[in-house]
């Protein structure tokens, strides 16, 4: 069953073409990564799918229904979107942030239901938020903040989740923490589409990859089949080695040095040092 289908998407900012004929479909219950160099259209693509930008050309269907056939509130019950830099209300606690994920499911008077409470409690447990539940969201570390935002997304209880670089600016420990949480969400049956820069992390955690460059899909398929040396070299205009990681064999991408290391001079090569002991 297909969760989302995009056909022939085009988008331009004035005269700069950002997406040029992008087509793909997302299977349900998979973690799909979007990779590619800077300015390849990754974030723009997510914004189009989330109706943060208007469709200029092409079509998008969610669960077989045209994207524009949904009201914004109805769309928010089907699709959750976490941008790169989400806005945070001053002083909001983690508990309140997660509860906000239930807003699309509430009526005019925002009545709180037993289902709302159940989904919030589940998000709190899955994202392991007990220790920070009453803290100000603005006081959290990078990894804690991303887990709190993911808690809000999980409480929203949509089948389709779009994440724009949730691991950017995080150290390796917090990257792993966030990606384990994202993988857990997908393993529970959600379809997750994530923009990610770290190719090794993408290859290890994602079921499938969509490679973008110059606004076009360059490759799509199972992550470990897509992540080839030829593709990475071409996408990033570089030269890499791809090695299997110990244990699970996940691809480890290592860029080759473009120049030889400079030979370090010895003391004898400096006349002024001769005779010095």
PLM regions and their residue ranges:
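Conserved structural motif at the start of ABC-family nucleotide-binding domains
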Residues: 4, 18-21
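Conserved ABC ATPase signature
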Residues: 111, 136-140
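ABC ATPase nucleotide-binding domains
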Residues: 235-277
């Amino acid at each position: 069953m297909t969760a989302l289908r995009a056909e022939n998407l085009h988008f331009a900012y004035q005269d700069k073409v950002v997406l040029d004929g992008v087509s793909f479909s997302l299977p349900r219950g998979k973690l799909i990564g979007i990779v590619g160099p800077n300015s390849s259209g990754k974030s723009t693509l997510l914004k189009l799918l989330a109706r943060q930008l208007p469709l200029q050309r092409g079509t998008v269907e969610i669960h077989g229904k045209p994207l524009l056939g949904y009201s914004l509130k109805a769309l928010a019950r089907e699709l959750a979107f976490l941008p790169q830099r989400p806005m945070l209300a001053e002083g909001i606690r983690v508990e309140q942030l997660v509860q906000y994920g239930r807003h699309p499911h509430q009526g005019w008077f925002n009545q709180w239901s037993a289902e709302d409470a159940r989904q919030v409690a589940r998000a709190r447990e899955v994202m392991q938020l007990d220790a920070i539940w009453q803290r100000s969201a603005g006081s959290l570390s990078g990894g804690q903040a991303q887990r709190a935002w993911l808690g809000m997304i999980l409480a929203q209880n949509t089948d389709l989740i779009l994440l724009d670089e949730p691991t950017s600016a995080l150290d390796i420990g917090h990257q792993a923490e966030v990606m384990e949480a994202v993988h857990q969400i997908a393993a529970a049956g959600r379809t997750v589409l994530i923009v990610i820069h770290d190719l090794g992390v993408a290859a290890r955690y994602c079921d499938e990859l969509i490679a973008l460059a110059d606004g076009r899909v360059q490759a799509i398929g199972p992550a470990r089949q897509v992540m080839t040396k030829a593709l990475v070299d071409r996408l990033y205009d570089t030269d890499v080695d791809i090695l299997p990681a110990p244990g699970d064999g996940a691809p480890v991408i290592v860029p080759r040095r473009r120049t030889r290391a400079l030979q370090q001079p010895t003391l004898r090569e400096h006349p002024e040092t001769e005779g010095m002991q």
